[in-house]
Amino acid sequence: MSERTALNRRALLAATGMAAAAALAGCSDGAPGDGDGAAEPTDTPTDDPTETPPTEPNGSLPEGSPSSPTERLRELVAGNAGFALDLHDRLVADEDADNVFVSPYSVSMALAMTYAGAAGSAEAAMRETLGFSLGEETHPAFAELQGELDDRATTDAGPGGGSGDDEDDEIDAFRLDVANALWGDAGYPFAADYLDLVDEHYGGGFNEADFATDHEAERERINEWVADATDQRIEELIPENGLSSSTVLVLTNAIYFMAGWEQEFDPDDTADATFTALDGTGSTVPMMSQNLRTDYADLPGAQAIELPYVGGEVSMVLVVPDEGEFESVEAQLSGPTLFGVFEALGDASGDLRMPRFEYEFDAELSEALEDLGMAAAFGPGADFSNMVETGGGPGIDDVFHEAFVSVDEEGTEAAAATAVDMIESAPAESFDLTLDRPFLFCIRDRPTDAVLFFGRVVDAGSAQG
């Protein structure tokens, strides 16, 4: 284990870095011109990994849209959950799929910035595939959701209001950082209205790039921005040769999450145990253990449990299928059924044993997105005319996604005490749950039900960092 990984294991309960990038290549009718009419780019990269600033919700809604911002937010979250499970199903369909971990929120936000420039069949394909049923209202809805998430995020204090100056405050902190940026080729005729929309609703600053002359140097610059935005967890989102001289625009989203459990695991209770992988092989893993009171559900063919993070507004929900039922339960999960799991959770107390795990996942998502229905948005014939002053605009070439997750015992005493104070009613039921077999998990924002991350662990032995 590297020195950095060891340090973070001591310092964090859960650290998650996630990034997505959509690279667009120019086509003949949208090639760079002499710069006339093009939006004026900035020369300074927006490389501070700060939270995306919220914008005020748009007060007027088009005909057929939800009647209030709250309904608009609900519709966005529901569409994103449906896309999350569709994407997960497509990724695990690959023969070599093992442990998978993605951020549907990150992928959706990067593609939403791209969607803002789409027209015609490309716009229709993206709207259907990504669950953007709000149409143009998708953009203020994302700003509204990000404003909600900004309310959860603190970077300088734990639940006890610490100063952030000592190690304990760092451990106790809840941190949720989201950053967006656009990297556009100098002289390409990007429409000012498009850049203004992305900046207003996503905080995506425009950075001038020179892909034609030195795309490799620009790749390294973008990767450095992503690394900074994910606390160095994602260091090479765009692989070598991932960009080319025909690249005209790269849209990036990075999300970094760190938090402690409200109810911590005692490291002294962690012991080696056997985890049986999906293929039936066994491996020895460090199994954490605690007796706790939390929300739990006994479902047909599975059990589910919720573990809140510091503050109680963001949590991890784990779905543990019965032995031999993993593939069946996984195949049945959809946006509505996942929300059904959330609704089924209720107050309970009992014993929980779950493995420590840490792993990385990366994927080039173009093929998966095309298979899900987005083919019209890829290639030189795609219609992104709303992105440029003249011509058809660039088409999507690649969508890169990389993720890191680390979960262990660390938490805070103050958070655990707060959790006890919040519980007043008697337990509805009891449980005894051991995650010694494949399981699914997500990290969700409880007030909005937004699914920030979704993954599966089918081989805990290979997920030990």
Predicted feature descriptions by range:
Residues 2-19:
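N-terminal secretory signal peptides and thylakoid transit peptides that target proteins
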Residues 26-27:
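N-terminal Sec signal peptide cleavage junction
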Residues 40-78:
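N-terminal low-complexity, Pro/Thr/Ser-rich intrinsically disordered segments
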Residues 59-71, 105-109, 121-129, 199-209, ...:
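Acidic/histidine-rich, surface-exposed loop or edge segments in extracytoplasmic proteins
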Residues 116-155, 269, 273-279:
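Active-site-surrounding "flap" and adjacent substrate/cofactor-binding loops of secreted or lumenal enzymes
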Residues 150-314, 347-424:
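Non-catalytic, conformational "gating/processing" segments within enzyme and secreted inhibitor domains
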Residues 251, 306-312, 317, 422-465:
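Extended hydrophobic
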Residues 314, 321-345:
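Internal alpha/beta scaffold segment
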